[in-house]
Amino acid sequence: SDDPAFPGALLTPYSLAVLPELDRVVSTNSSMDEVNAFSGVTYQVWQLSTLKLLKTAYLDVDKNLYGHISPEEARVGPDGAVYIQTLGCGIERITDVDRDQPRSKLVYTFPGSFCGVPTIVGHYLVQSVPVMHGLIVLDISNGNKPVEVSRLKLNDGFFSHWTGWDAKTGRLVVTGDHARLYLVKLDQSTGALTMDNAFHDANGKPGFDFANRKWPQGWTGTGQPHGVVFSR
């Protein structure tokens, strides 16, 4: 990821989106190190077949001056553009990656900061937004002008972070800073979110409680779920 044209930039690969039909990969540059957490401001375009670095570019800066900072998760949208979530709670839309000059545009900014892992389902982008303790759904049918269509607060004080989609059940899994995992229903026709209250454990509260459990390896204690994927 080193690029002599960007000697002072943080060029630490964080995530990537693959576009095989264009023979391209788009990667983000951000850091898990707290010291450099808010230093990343670039993305890179690679040739998939050779893994040759084709372009390093700065993300679009909007009037709020922070929505572009720390690009993290990259996702391919229904329009073929790459949507990048930032720690500054922005959504950057990357286009023209098969040309000499790819383009970046900050198309949306969520409230707060430290937004986490997004999920795209059809033409909806689901974003974890810690400051509102839940999720916000954008309709990205018009990628240049996303529109909020729904939001769901999961729990007072819940610092939402990870989202993942299961097409078989039509459910999103959500984790955060609590010892609890939630399942959320997504209406794919409207983008509306609702809690799956049928998914609960012995305490009767929505979600699965990881606190004070006896685990298969013999350890008893509290686990905090983080990254979650569904089996196929």
Residue ranges and their predicted role:
Residues S1-R232:
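Feature marking well-ordered beta-strand scaffolds used for ligand recognition
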